[in-house]
Regions:
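Catalytic cores of enzyme domains
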Residues: 30, 36, 66-67, 72-225
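Non-catalytic, usually N-terminal nucleic-acid engagement modules in DNA/RNA processing proteins
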Residues: 1-77, 82
Length: 225
């Protein structure tokens, strides 16, 4: 029998910096089509893992190191999630990796994409952190410099407490004010069209690079508390 403690130790051995668990009863407020049981009907637990992004990548003018780091960390998370899925199956459970990309929902006019499940909302429900005004999940130890992955499973696991402490100060609007294209609203909603058109660009070789991370870098909680 797998326990939450054993599972977390396993994810740390694989290279995850954080691991949180949510029970399925926490997802009653999910939109239709984006509930974990809409993906796998026998889901009992949602496991969320996170790997941190090196803070030094925020302090350079060239977008290429940050882009490379984003891609490397994303690939690492996918590998950890796959290994976790196989580990659960080996122990007699069903499990499914939830990718951040590719995803099915896409509105071309607004350039709005939605993952099959929202990883940041899964992370919140699993106690990884809280969602900041910049719409990024913010962890107390690593701030918003984290990338997320998830696995849903029929294993019944002990859930972690949801983080109730507010990391964003009521009076702070640094991320909103610093966005070059005004993509961040006061209600934690980001205009994906404005953000993508400015921050996701193709260089002369046709390679996509991430040209802006202002909302991450100006946050006082960028590196955690």
């Amino acid at each position: 029998m797998i326990t939450s403690t054993l599972l977390k130790e396993f994810t740390k051995e694989l290279g995850a910096d954080l691991c949180g668990i949510a029970s399925i009863d926490r997802f009653g407020d999910c939109p239709t089509g984006f509930h974990p049981t809409d993906v796998y009907r026998n889901t009992n637990s949602v496991i969320v893992i996170a790997c941190r992004i090196p803070g030094s990548s925020m302090n350079i003018s060239s977008p290429y190191p940050y882009t490379a780091i984003e891609n490397i960390v994303s690939a690492r998370i996918s590998q950890i999630a796959l290994s976790l899925t196989l580990y659960l199956e080996k122990n007699g459970y069903h499990a499914l990796l939830i990718p951040s990309d590719p995803y099915d929902y896409w509105d071309a006019e607004t350039m709005t994409g939605k993952g099959i499940l929202s990883l940041k909302h899964l992370g919140y429900k699993a106690g990884i952190g809280t969602i900041g005004k910049n719409s990024l999940l913010c962890n107390n130890e690593y701030g918003n410099l984290i990338k997320l992955g998830a696995v849903i499973t029929d294993a019944v696991l002990t859930a972690d407490p949801i983080v109730t402490a507010k990391l964003c100060k009521d009076t702070c609007t640094l991320c909103i004010d610093s966005c070059p294209v005004g993509a961040i609203g006061l209600n934690k909603v980001v205009s994906q069209k404005k953000c993508r058109e400015f921050s996701e660009i193709n260089n002369k070789r046709g390679i996509e690079i991430y040209a802006c991370h202002a909302c991450r870098s100006v946050c006082p909680n960028r590196n955690g508390r």
